[in-house]
Every structure is written in C-alpha cells, then in structure tokens.
Amino acid sequence: MSAAPLVGYSSSGSEDEAEAGARVRPGAEGRSRGQSPLPGQRLPVPDSVLHMFPSTEEGPVDDSAKHGGRVRTFPHERGNWATHVYIPYEAREEFLDLLDALLCHAQTYVPRLVRMEAFHLSLSQSVVLRHHWILPFVQALKDRVASFHRFCFTTDQVKIYTNQEKTRTFVGLEVTSGHAHFLDLVAEVDRVMEEFDLSTFYQDPSFHISLAWCVGDARLQMEGPCLQELQGIVDEFEDSEMLLRAYAEQIRCKSGNKFFSMPLK
C-alpha cells in the first residue's frame, strides 16, 4: 500500500484558535526565620493562600478529550501562536449535500468519521510564530502575493490523507485543475517561511479540501473499495462537474485567534 498524502494541519483543533502556551509562575523565595524584609519589598504570600487563587499566567492543561482525542503536534508555550496559510473555500448548499452523501457512506467503513466545520486549501504547514513576528510575517505575505490574480480550480478526486504523525485521517477532494496556480502561490509562501526560519510546504503537495476526519490511522479501512465507492458518488452526483469548480479569490493567514485576509487581484 502506498503511503497516504500528508495534510499540513496541526494535530490540534480548537486550541489553535487561542494563544498557545503555559508558563509556570515563579515561586516566592523564602526568608530565614526572624529576618526582616528589605525596604520596599513585600512579605511572601503563604502557600495556603496562593493555592486558593491559581495563577492566571498558567495556560490550560492540554486535555485531548476536549478536542476529539486529537494529539497536539507541538507543545503549548506562552507567546507562541499556531499559524497557517490557506485559501478559504465557501461551501454552497449543493456541496454540503454531496458531503453528506459521502460522509454517510464513509461512516459504514469508519463510523467515527466527523464532518469538517469549515473548508480550505492549505498553502503551508501549521507553524509556530512568536507573537511579535505575526504582523511582519503577514506583511511579508502580502508583499509576496500582491501581484497574483484570482483563478479557477476544480476539486473532484476523492483521496485519503493523514497528518505527519498518523494520528488523524482525512477524506478530501483533490485539486485536478488549477494545480500550477497553487504551486506558484506556495513558492511565494515558502519564501516567507524561509525568511522567518520556518518549515516550508511539502515537496510534492496534493492540494485538496478536507471534508471529514477521524482520530487515528484509518487508511486500511478507507483505501480500496471504500475509496472507489466514494469516487463513484462524486462522479454520479448531479452537476458535480460545475459544483466542484470554484474560484480562489483570497489568501488567508490564521495565527492564533487572529485572521488576516489578502485578496487576489
């Protein structure tokens, strides 16, 4: 069996929408018995009182049960922001009807599959930016893609993907026309990544829209008959050729809970 293509997401979902990080609050150093505090210094607060009020500087515990069992790719660190560059995809009602048909059939093979909440096509891996890098990073992106025009693309090939750690599996629709435009955009995004000493995109990327996902490596169940049957549903769906044709009109960068849009000309 050939290796499944990789997706460029972090393994965590909702937590990436907020600042990543947890920092341990430095403990107060104790004094010798009977030693007076120096002028201007506060007396140390007893531990019994400190434990009544947990430090607000400490980040949340990374509980995978709270985000569908997903495992974080990189650890929380205060001041680090998970960052992703992509083209958003606005799903029409007919697209969601097709998605429902695909998901219903795929769940007969892998019942734990769930639908994606939003749709996009990745132009980068998920990387970590320091907070003070965000605006310079976004400005560099804007400068790099300023000359690009909107373009049409088609996504009508069903494909199974995993993340790098093989902790999540995705059902996606691969780009079958417009691939060269995506490569040109990735080349510019990669140059920005290199300027900030960040990971570039995959060498031979498979541009796609992820439709559904599940925890774990489900390739064995989904490749073969399941994949062929899903492709049949797409091919036979009414007006699927027109339905799965779309325009790339903007590039978006998500960094923590911040979104930056860069319209194409």
Swiss-Prot record:
Main location: nucleus
Gene Ontology molecular function: 3'-5'-RNA exonuclease activity; lyase activity; poly(U)-specific exoribonuclease activity, producing 3' uridine cyclic phosphate ends
Record's keyword terms, sorted: Hydrolase, Lyase, Nuclease, Nucleus
GO annotations of cellular component type: intercellular bridge; nucleoplasm; nucleus
Active site per UniProt: 120 (proton acceptor), 208 (proton donor)
EC annotation from Swiss-Prot or TrEMBL: 4.6.1.-
Region Disordered, annotated ranges: 1-67
Claim: Nuclease is one of the keywords in the record: yes
InterPro entries: Cyclic_Pdiesterase, Usb1
Taxonomic superkingdom: Eukaryota
Binding site for UMP: 164, 202, 206-210
Entry's family note: Belongs to the 2H phosphoesterase superfamily. USB1 family.
UniProt subunit comment: Interacts with PLRG1, CDC5L and PRPF19.
Protein name from the UniProt record: U6 snRNA phosphodiesterase 1
Organism of derivation: Bos taurus
Gene that encodes the chain: USB1
